[in-house]
């Protein structure tokens, strides 16, 4: 895990990605289905990511959780609807924990299943006769070295950073309180948003007012976004940071060579 994922925060992105894809899979069957993601910071120091998506059956758990590189999304007809498809995301959790527990009940039927994997490569799978809602939850027991990541303010900042644009509501639960931490309908992705709304949003994101804002869209790459013109002089050699999203999941805040070198006076928000 540590060789694949250099950033210990990555597990938040990967678990949110799995939640979103599970809900999307169920919405592809029932477009009126209302999905949600719940994240719990518990007093016993466990962290739980829960979704009400499509869930997993026993044979799917064996195939997709116990074999590195297997993915339930890669070869499906609607694969383009999903964020992830490589089947290694769960490994990112082992950077911050020695044990991962996945509890799931499939919308397609079958008994609820519980899979517990450990950092040494061993795992245990059990079936349950207890009633549980459709969907999945992942339970982590953080390592001592990484406990600081699970302090409320720190964890919330990471969660919002990756998830604030995702299309389903994300609720953070802490000390008996529930808080919505994302905006499922962000203004910069709203084609009806006014110029003032775009400028106000850009000022909030980039901590600087812009002279103007321009929408961008490419049909071939299915890329949409907003370009912001900076109101001050910058050096030609300065590389501005941007925000790049993949299906609304934060991918990068680096320059990424998105713009030509002469566009040093531009910052942008992009979703692909």
Regions found by a protein language model. Name each.
Residues 1-149:
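GHKL (Bergerat-fold) ATPase N-terminal catalytic module, capturing the glycine-rich phosphate-binding loop
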């Amino acid at each position: 895990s540590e060789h694949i994922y250099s950033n210990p925060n990555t597990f938040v992105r990967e678990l949110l990605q799995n939640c979103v894809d599970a809900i999307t899979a169920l919405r592809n069957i029932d477009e009126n289905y209302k999905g949600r993601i719940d994240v719990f910071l518990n007093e016993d120091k466990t962290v739980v990511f829960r979704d009400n998506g499509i869930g997993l059956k026993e044979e799917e758990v064996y195939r997709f959780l116990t074999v590195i590189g297997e993915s339930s999304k890669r070869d499906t007809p609607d694969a383009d609807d999903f964020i992830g498809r490589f089947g290694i995301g769960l490994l990112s959790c082992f950077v911050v924990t020695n044990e991962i527990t996945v509890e799931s009940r499939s919308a397609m039927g079958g008994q609820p299943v519980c899979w517990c994997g450990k950092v040494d490569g061993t795992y245990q799978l059990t079936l349950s006769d207890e009633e549980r809602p459709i969907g999945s939850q992942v339970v982590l027991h953080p390592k001592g070295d990484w406990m600081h990541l699970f302090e409320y303010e720190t964890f919330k900042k990471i969660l919002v950073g990756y998830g604030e644009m995702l299309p389903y509501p994300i609720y953070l639960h802490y000390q008996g309180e529930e808080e919505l931490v994302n905006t499922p309908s962000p203004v910069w992705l709203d084609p009806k948003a006014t110029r003032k709304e775009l400028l106000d949003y850009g000022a909030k994101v980039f901590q600087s007012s812009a002279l103007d804002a321009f929408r961008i869209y490419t049909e071939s790459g299915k890329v949409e976004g907003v370009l912001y013109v900076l109101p001050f002089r910058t050096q030609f050699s300065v590389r501005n940071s941007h925000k790049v999203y993949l299906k609304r999941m934060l991918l990068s805040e680096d320059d990424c060579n998105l713009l030509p070198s002469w566009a040093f006076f531009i910052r942008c928000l992009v979703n692909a």
